């Protein structure tokens, strides 16, 4: 009979409680930090959203109701304020802003996309200088060039025309838009471009068939940023346009305010109409905006 080997018996020691406590501390800190962030974002949302909600609610009130019940819902709703605001001049300002904003966006995005394509895919002398020139354009404020720009517009016969606003707006937005779109184009694979050249595509074909369809998020983002700047710009709109029939929303609201100093409900209805398009545009294109900003910041 074979002798039996002695086997050592092992006993598992319980894990000390202090290790469990150490693991719980980071989780507790993370929970407190997340709660603080949500509280901050909620307060920030109230600070941003409440003035807009107050403006919309007050647009449905009459002047007496605005002063007597400033922080509450309208005691009686007056949707006719919007009709009065539209008929008393907002319609003209609104359509002028739509024309100027649409043409500015098309010109800015198209020229910037062409320039960004050349800067991201071709090598030529002066390429670095052109990029520096774009950066320099970002540093030039409109106030600095106001006097010479006014003289140029007068000499070209553009004063009191839509082009007196469209061309300066596009000129000031193109440098930033070029850099933004170029960063996105750099993230597009060169293999796709090479395959298109092998299939017989020209540079124009590659641009229109590959780059533009793949760059919808950044193009929409550029359009939104340009539209926001153009729609709300005030200085050029008040200086380069003197004709009441050509004024855009920011400049026209000054005349609208002077004409309705006592009718606050109609005035706030006009302000609501002027603010609505950009808010709606951003809400509809929000997913493209976020994707465009995130992808456009990958490479520089």
Curated annotation (Swiss-Prot):
Gene Ontology biological-process annotations: transmembrane transport
Signal peptide positions on this chain: none
Membrane topology: Multi-pass membrane protein
Keywords: Cell membrane, Membrane, Transmembrane, Transmembrane helix, Transport
SUPFAM superfamilies from the UniProt entry: MetI-like (SSF161098)
InterPro entries: MetI-like, MetI-like_sf
Localization in the cell: Cell membrane
Keyword Metal-binding tagged: no
CDD domains from the UniProt entry: TM_PBP2
Residue spans crossing the bilayer: 37-57, 98-118, 129-149, 161-181, 204-224, 264-284
Domain ABC transmembrane type-1: 94-285
A single GO cellular-component term on record: plasma membrane
Family: Belongs to the binding-protein-dependent transport system permease family. MalFG subfamily.
PANTHER family: ABC TRANSPORTER PERMEASE PROTEIN MG189-RELATED-RELATED, SN-GLYCEROL-3-PHOSPHATE TRANSPORT SYSTEM PERMEASE PROTEIN UGPE
Function: Probably part of the binding-protein-dependent transport system YurMNO. Probably responsible for the translocation of the substrate across the membrane.
Identification of the protein by name: Probable ABC transporter permease protein YurM
Organism field: Bacillus subtilis (strain 168)
Lineage: Bacteria, Bacillati, Bacillota, Bacilli, Bacillales
